[in-house]
Amino acid sequence: LAWAAGDSRARGFLVGATSGRTTLNGEGLQHEDGHSHVISATVPNCVSYDPTYSYEIAVIVQDGLRRMYGEQEDIYYYLTVMNENYPHPSMPVGCEEGIRRGMYRFLAAKKGKGPEVQLIGGGAILREVEAAVVLLAEEGVRAAVWSATSFTELRREALEVERLNALHPDKKAKTAWVTEQLSSSKGPIIAATDYMKVHADQIRAFLPDGRDYRVLGTDGFGRSDSRRQLRRHLEVDAAHVAY
């Protein structure tokens, strides 16, 4: 369906209602999706997002309508959403551009002494990343949280910036969004999603120089168990993010 939509220049929203490998509890690869965003990245006119909160979806859908039916772009959107119940916060001020471009700072690190770390989460695992902040605070580590709505869009934009800089060496070099956002931050960077590690690893080449980057993901087969146990088994729960 994804490739057919690409070839036919279809427009619209393709919504996967069981985001990630731990949201719908089943077995194997068919019922626990840890790879659809890896596949969707191969379709050039498929714009993929893995949002967590309702306000993120609202911004993405609004922008999709503008691009597809206002600007008449031959693109379509792939959104993965959860069937899990959890509270949705109010939208942080000024985060719309970051939602559209693939990442924004959801929670700033608390001021104080001690080491600092940058935590990036997406989709079903963003809330595990939020929970990891509390665990790290108990160890004296301050953590900022970034919501990655689309690692694929971050990579695509960064590759285009890299290309333009190579083609126009006489002009001032542009900076990719992901590089710009993280350049003023401190400490190692840890990313966790409900997808294979290769998904979040897409941005590794575009991180600020000298930064350590570790990716947690759901490689392997799924299992029949609770979400809590699945996330522990696949090493993407709050404890694995923190420790």
Task: Indicate residue ranges for each PLM-predicted region.
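Thiamine diphosphate
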Residues: 12-13, 18, 22-30, 41, ...
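Acidic (Asp/Glu)-rich catalytic clusters
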Residues: 2-9, 208
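Surface-exposed loop and adjacent secondary-structure segments within mature catalytic domains
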Residues: 2-3, 30-38
